[in-house]
Curated annotation (Swiss-Prot):
UniProt pathway: Carbohydrate biosynthesis; gluconeogenesis; Carbohydrate degradation; glycolysis; D-glyceraldehyde 3-phosphate from glycerone phosphate: step 1/1
Name of the protein in question: Triosephosphate isomerase
Tagged with keyword Calcium: no
Catalytic activity: D-glyceraldehyde 3-phosphate = dihydroxyacetone phosphate
GO molecular function list: triose-phosphate isomerase activity
EC top class named in words: isomerase
EC annotation from Swiss-Prot or TrEMBL: 5.3.1.1
Amino acid sequence: MRRVLVAGNWKMHKTPSEARVWFAELKRLLPPLQSEAAVLPAFPILPVAKEVLAETQVGYGAQDVSAHKEGAYTGEVSARMLSDLGCRYAIVGHSERRRYHGETDALVAEKAKRLLEEGITPILCVGEPLEVREKGEAVPYTLRQLRGSLEGVEPPGPEALVIAYEPVWAIGTGKNATPEDAEAMHQAIRKALSERYGEAFASRVRILYGGSVNPKNFADLLSMPNVDGGLVGGASLELESFLALLRIAG
């Protein structure tokens, strides 16, 4: 049985002082959870997350990581640093990193390796732009991305890897794939994982949907057998909507 994960990607929003208030309110209002919750804020907020969320059911993590272990790499943040801050997760391969920073599948794979070396679970993002979907090539495009981003990546177990399918055309647009569209892609991803790591492994890897997830569509998405949670953007910034997602997840 795969445990539902609701992971909030805050992107470049909130200051550390704003986050402190948000975390304190979350801590006060958090219902008992059967599912798993995580918040992924900007790097400067992570020490605040460590301080406020340490003894709660809410995990936290980063939105990116360096592909390098350490050294003269100005502006980079290593997996070891994230581990020292208590991060449970880190996103790699988000479409905004691929688009605006030119990140390749090979670079994403190196980042995933660095995280696994430090015991941090990568949330590895894959997904197609609109023009690819309109050509009917969404599945082969996404699976090529998945295979390239997992090249040489050997998680110690299925719980050590999370995949997030994020159709690029649905991110921040208010559009979202239908539950049936999401399920079809998640099935294809799980099949590719089975070919790469074996069926027993693939059956236990969580595959999240990311793309304008909100309290209105989340229950329908979760009703699909291969949708194991959400990588949530805008709806994770408002405490009320994030709590609503957690209540839906159970």
